[in-house]
Amino acid sequence: MSITSLKNQKEFELINKLGKKLHERYFILVIATKLPKIFLESKYNTFLGIKVSRKLNKKAVVRNKIKRRIRHLIRIIVSDSSFKAIKFAMIIIPRKGFEEINFSHLNYELSKVILRNI
């Protein structure tokens, strides 16, 4: 399973427009399964965008740690065999409390939401 990141503002706007917005306690997930042509022609199956606001934490070190945790969570979730044939894109926006919650609980919450909406 191959994952790549959303590169520019245009890609983020496309996913925001085409995707379904899901509000959870620790994050907001925008997930799109009906992708435009630019994504379908790619060799990658999963497209990931992460938006960590300065409102969440002023320190860049903490914001970068949150991004690393999200990337690792997605790698774990997408490595499951049920995602092999599906192409989808998502944007994850963490909320307050995301950095304090333990990793296993985040894994459970995120995988539950993704599996329910693909």
Swiss-Prot record:
The keyword Nuclease applies. Belongs to the RnpA family. Keywords: Endonuclease, Hydrolase, Nuclease, RNA-binding, tRNA processing. GO terms for molecular function: 3'-tRNA processing endoribonuclease activity; ribonuclease P activity; tRNA binding. Consists of a catalytic RNA component (M1 or rnpB) and a protein subunit. It catalyses: Endonucleolytic cleavage of RNA, removing 5'-extranucleotides from tRNA precursor. RNaseP catalyzes the removal of the 5'-leader sequence from pre-tRNA to produce the mature 5'-terminus. It can also cleave other RNA substrates such as 4.5S RNA. The protein component plays an auxiliary but essential role in vivo by binding to the 5'-leader sequence and broadening the substrate specificity of the ribozyme. It comes from the Bacteria. One of its GO terms (cellular component) is ribonuclease P complex. InterPro entries: Ribosomal_Su5_D2-typ_SF, Ribsml_uS5_D2-typ_fold_subgr, RNase_P, RNase_P_CS. It comes from Rickettsia africae (strain ESF-5). The keyword Nuclease applies. Its EC number is 3.1.26.5. It is an enzyme of class 3 (hydrolase). PROSITE patterns: RIBONUCLEASE_P. GO terms for biological process: tRNA 5'-leader removal. This is Ribonuclease P protein component. The gene is rnpA.
